[in-house]
A protein has these predicted regions:
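GST-like domain detector, emphasizing the conserved glutathione-binding G-site
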Residues: 1-110
Length: 110
């Protein structure tokens, strides 16, 4: 498993924090967005959308969204639950995440 990151970008930072909080040992590859490394032919093979974060697997599969990566890691490494323990907690956390992403992050992008 490899995590394609960019230290200065906000979306991969969220995944990087998630990985650290769960104490997951994963190979991290920094992608230099300022110099256009995400547009290179090599990176386009990994993610044709040319974005980070990316979590890639030995079989060639990839996850390319913070939500997808977090969901996968939460299911794969449940010992440190970050997305809630009970159904109520999971629902409240999902609701808060949606609110942050839609009302907070989307507003900042405008």
């Amino acid at each position: 498993m490899k995590f394609y990151d960019c230290k200065t970008a906000p979306s991969p930072r969220r995944v990087r924090i998630f990985i650290a909080e769960k104490n997951i040992d994963v190979e991290t590859i920094d992608i230099d967005l300022r110099n256009g490394e995400q547009l290179s032919p090599e990176f386009k093979k990994i993610n044709p959308n040319c974005t980070v974060p990316v979590l890639s697997f030995d079989n060639g599969d990839t996850l390319t969204s913070t939500a997808g990566i977090r969901s996968y890691l939460e299911a794969k490494y449940p010992d440190i639950p970050l997305m809630g323990r009970t159904d109520d907690e999971k629902g409240k956390i999902a609701d808060l995440q949606w609110r942050i992403e839609m009302e907070g992050l989307m507003a900042m992008s405008e």
